[in-house]
Amino acid sequence: MFGSYASIADVKGVLGITATTDDVTIRKIAEAASRSIDNYCNRHFATQSATKYFDGARALWLPDLLDITTLKTDEDGDATFENTFVTTDYIKYGHGLEDSLNTLPTTRLEISHDSDYGSFASGVKKGVEIAGLWGYGDGISATPYVLDTTLTAAITSLTALTCAVTAVTNLSAGQTILIDTEQMYIYSIATLTLTVERGVNGTDAATHLINAPLYIYQYPSDIRQACIDLSVALYQLRNKKGVQSEKIGDYSYTLTNVTAQGQKGLIESILDSSIRSYKRMRF
């Protein structure tokens, strides 16, 4: 999974760093912090285009799902998914109790009353195939990204690793961006040129026209802040073994259980205090 839930600019801003010497180190720390958040929450907040398979059932409990491209079932277990569901065949439920019909991401599917099918291939192992967009995203929208800038030159090669843009005011290394249907991950920025990883998170590298819009992926503010907090603490911990609290300008953090449990204690200390409500039970 590509993506950091806080940009390099976010982390450097808290640390008060303006030099670029440690940019790669900070980016890698922010990436590691993001994966720690994923592991802690039992879910990922980056979005991934993928096809996933599930055992058949009357109701389907799913990993976080933002959009369904196709849903097919194999009713007779012959490994051919002969039934293609339409949106009126199922009902999507999100988190919560009172408002689960109106929340994202989707975590459960049930057969609608007027469906042509009685179940999702109930009783058939690997009886369900779902192609779609997976992940928590920003927890609000099925399209968790915002328009930011445009390309100033077409991208004509599938292997090109740079793209020229109109402005970089809101862009930073560590961000995941979307151009057309392709996700890219920003490694670095020089003037108005981005160096990127192409076709990340299940998307394919593609060509793009000049003036194509560029979008920046968004995450819940609590998740972004937790990533900043954890990245700052991990960065400081490199040279300050044993330090449990620090104040940097108006920013401060306090760690518990760090001496006893090392880095694991640091991670749990920060995440327990900030994003416990995002944890999902394993199923």
Task: Name each model-derived stretch.
Residues 1-283:
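Divalent metal-cofactor coordination and adjacent catalytic microenvironments
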